[in-house]
Amino acid sequence: MDKSDTDWDGFDPEAREEREIGREMVSKSTGLGSVVAHFYRGEMSVVTTWRSRLDETINWAVTIISAILIYAFSTEGNHVILLTGMVVIAVFLGIEARRYQAYDVYRARARMLQENLFANTLDPSQGVEHRDWRRELSEDYRNPTIKTPYVEALSRRLRRIYFPFFALMLAAWLFKLMAFSTQPVLETAAVGNVPGFVVFGVVGLFYALITAVAFWPRERQSKGEFSKVEHGEWKEAE
């Protein structure tokens, strides 16, 4: 058997001296600290890149929503443009949920390092947050996996960003139907040969669906960055 295989068989990433590698980085002068610094810098660079991609999606959504609203109320055009706006927002939501899944992969790695390496380096007395953090991180680099289910990604982006967009578009659509026509609302809501009550039914089902996705209770899988609010208490001198 190769000597390296023998050494690896004896390696236990959950052993105290291995999982608390942050203590070694402070107490001993090794090249490990330099390697980890570059490694962490690279991870944060990827996190920042994916964060900017999320922001780009939001910026495009805001721009298109603004254009649709301006066009819808600057002419006597059909209310269908606002229904189209709802579809456009849904498309952007789907794109952003996919991007959020990728973003969370790299954010989870960065948080794993922050919680178990850097926090332990600053205060070794607290120990690590995850006993097998090195094994988990190693496995994730060998076999990268999505950490957040797609439905949860949709839910988080809906609550944070897109639900207000949908609410704004719904309010604009209803206002357009009621304020810019002398006909009954159900007649005004008709789209071509599709009766108004069918249009209302489809819109109602769609909003019921996104409300359920956004607010249905579920166990969180994504890696959060903030555990609680302290409002500056942490930096007060004793």
Where are these regions (language model features)?
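A hydrophobic membrane-anchoring alpha-helix module
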Residues: T145-E238
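Inner-leaflet juxtamembrane helices
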Residues: I89-S138, A212-K228
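Transmembrane helix-loop junctions and nearby membrane-interface residues
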Residues: I70, S74, L93-Y100, L174-S181, ...
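Cytosolic-side membrane-entry/anchor segment at the start of a transmembrane helix
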Residues: G22-T75, T211-E219
